[in-house]
UniProtKB/Swiss-Prot annotation:
Similarity remark: Belongs to the CTP synthase family.
Subunit structure, as described in the record: Homotetramer.
Catalysed transformations (reactions): UTP + L-glutamine + ATP + H2O = CTP + L-glutamate + ADP + phosphate + 2 H(+); L-glutamine + H2O = L-glutamate + NH4(+); UTP + NH4(+) + ATP = CTP + ADP + phosphate + 2 H(+)
InterPro entries for this protein: Class_I_gatase-like (IPR029062), CTP_synthase (IPR004468), CTP_synthase_N (IPR017456), GATASE (IPR017926), GATase1_CTP_Synthase (IPR033828), P-loop_NTPase (IPR027417)
Residue ranges annotated for the Glutamine amidotransferase type-1 domain, each copy included: 290-541
Binding site for L-glutamine: G351, L379, G380, M381, Q382, E402, R469
Primary enzyme class: ligase
Gene designation: pyrG
Name listed for the protein in its UniProt record: CTP synthase
Protein's job: Catalyzes the ATP-dependent amination of UTP to CTP with either L-glutamine or ammonia as the source of nitrogen. Regulates intracellular CTP levels through interactions with the four ribonucleotide triphosphates.
Length: 543
């Protein structure tokens, strides 16, 4: 039977529930347990696919094509279980399903209510997502007290009762602020947060207290007394300069043992050797590089969370500290390419819309002409192709039909049909809805032997995740290749261009897919490793 750990948050948002939950999952996995994680988001959007990255951060894409919360990226970076569509759902998704069933007549004329119909659907989805594992860690988005979270909290209260105390635990994460003027930590916000949680019938079994510094034992005992939580179950989680230190910090306080004892699980001690190796590499770099991230959502780094992490992972593999300099592509348009001076490499990540596009094209041009290592991801590949078409292939005014429908050279256009990795044919048009209609999920890519990417991956066939509507226009592909563009990766049916390279450049690679979603701190990713290595070589040669 699956054991459940329900994770809630209190006092303020953005405390790191996802990191704390994923760190606990990493320890349990290191004890040989089969672990999965779920994220329940209270917002009414069906999924985050059409939400602004400035408001919500990155959209993380799973192998099976789900557009999900960025916390699922944390989950995959901390544990080896692959997330799927079942691991993330929203209020909007729940209501959509319940209303669909009501219209179909499944409820036999009943009056549809939050309790029991909405809460039952939430429970059904939790159970389905947790099927077949030893432990399922279920994170509830938002904070206790939010009106949007109430159906989810009621659902996990009911589910905890139904599976029984031996198979359910509640973990609550709160803030314990430090008041510098008085030199004291304040436990009252945590006490009130737990009081709020208990008022709806949930008694936390573990309290994780976020604070600037480690909590003194007397303060932990005080919190335990007023929240009815055992002393040993009040966990102090101080600020850390690396999220990959959190598993060891939680293990040192015996959090995993609390879980194992509660569920009566027999398993060996956690072996955190892999995480120790990650921390050693992070703490002992032999050099550093500065990589320019050219985008239009740079005011919120979480909009590029997986790319940021993938660069750090590649730095670990190369024993280099990767400093990321965020460059607003609109600043390149207004101030010129001098903004890019001093960079050891340039990365243009995915994105949508016309704003700032000419700045990204200028960044690709600068990288090509100055022989600066370049990695283009999704839109980053498309702007590289537009730049090459305009300035090398003689196609003046070349563009994507997304940005200029009247361009005489639409080198990038809407994909109207493609073959998915499972062999099914997908079709789209300009009239298709924005949400959930892109080429999504893991797709097979054929790499050309002898190419840089083939050498990096060490394989002729790879699987990478996609999230896009536009692709290279095959009608103009021959002209691009005749001018020196190398197409080194093709789709399942070998019709869509997936990877390009420049043969006369030390390191210029761009892919239509999102390799960042497959990068982890323990394993890295070959494309990012090669990119950061090239940045290190560029630094050596120019300093």
């Amino acid at each position: 039977m699956t054991n459940y750990i329900f994770v809630t948050g209190g006092v303020v948002s953005s405390l790191g529930k996802g990191i704390a939950a994923a760190s606990l999952a990493a320890i349990l996995e290191a004890r040989g347990l089969n672990v999965t994680m779920l994220k329940l988001d209270p917002y009414i959007n069906v999924d985050p696919g059409t939400m602004s990255p400035i408001q919500h951060g990155e959209v993380f894409v799973t192998d099976d094509g789900a557009e999900t919360d960025l916390d699922l990226g944390h989950y995959e970076r901390f544990i080896r279980t692959r997330m799927t569509k079942r691991n993330n759902f929203t209020t909007g998704r729940v209501y959509e399903e319940v209303i669909k069933r009501e219209r179909r007549g499944d409820y036999l004329g009943a009056t549809i209510q939050v309790i029991p119909h909405i809460t039952n659907e939430i429970k059904r989805r939790i159970i389905a997502g947790a099927e077949g594992v030893d432990v399922a860690i279920v994170e509830i988005g938002g904070t206790v007290g939010d009106i949007e979270s109430q159906p989810f909290l009621e659902a996990i209260r009911q589910l905890g009762t139904e599976v029984g105390r031996d198979h359910a635990m509640y973990m609550h994460l709160t803030l314990v602020p430090y008041i510098a003027v008085s030199g004291e930590v304040k436990t009252k916000p945590t006490q009130h947060s737990v009081k709020e949680l208990r008022s709806i019938g949930i008694q936390p079994d573990i309290l994780v207290c976020r604070s600037e510094n480690a909590l003194p034992s007397n303060e932990r005992s005080k919190i335990a007394l007023f929240t009815n939580v055992a002393d040993k179950a009040v966990i102090s989680l101080k600020d850390a300069n690396s999220i990959y230190k959190i598993p060891a910090a939680l293990k040192a306080q015996g959090m995993d043992e609390l879980v194992v004892q509660r569920f009566g699980l027999e398993c060996p001690e956690a072996d955190l050797t892999e995480w120790e190796q990650v921390l050693y590499a992070e703490s002992n770099p032999v050099g550093e590089v500065t990589i320019g991230m050219v985008g239009k959502y740079v005011e919120l780094p979480d909009a590029y969370k997986s790319v940021n992490e993938a660069l750090k992972h590649a730095g670990l593999k190369n024993r280099l500290t990767v400093n990321i300099r965020y460059v607003d592509s609109q600043d390149i348009e207004s101030k010129g390419e001098q903004i890019l001076h001093g960079l050891d490499a340039i990365l243009v990540p995915g994105g949508f819309g016309e704003r700032g596009i000419e700045g990204k094209i200028a960044a690709a041009k600068y990288a090509r002409e100055q022989k600066v290592p370049y990695l283009g991801i999704c839109l980053g590949m498309q702007v590289a192709i537009i730049e090459f078409a305009r300035n090398v292939a003689g196609m003046e005014s070349a563009n994507s039909s997304e940005f200029d429908p009247q361009t005489p050279y639409p080198v990038v256009g809407l994909i109207t049909e493609w073959l998915d990795a499972d062999g099914s044919t997908a079709q789209r048009s300009e009239a298709s809805d924005l949400g959930g209609t892109m080429r999504l999920g893991s797709q097979l890519c054929h790499l050309i032997p002898g190419s840089k990417v083939h050498d990096l991956y060490g394989s002729a066939e790879i699987y990478e995740r996609h999230r896009h509507r536009y692709e290279v226009n095959n009608n103009l592909r021959d002209k691009l290749e005749a001018s020196g563009l190398k197409v080194t990766g093709l789709s399942t049916d070998k019709r869509l261009v997936e990877v390009i390279e420049l043969g006369d450049h030390p390191w210029f690679v761009a892919g239509q897919f999102h390799p960042e979603f497959n990068s982890t701190p323990r394993d890295g990713h070959p494309l990012f490793e090669g990119f950061v290595k090239a940045a290190g070589e560029y630094y050596k040669n120019n300093n």
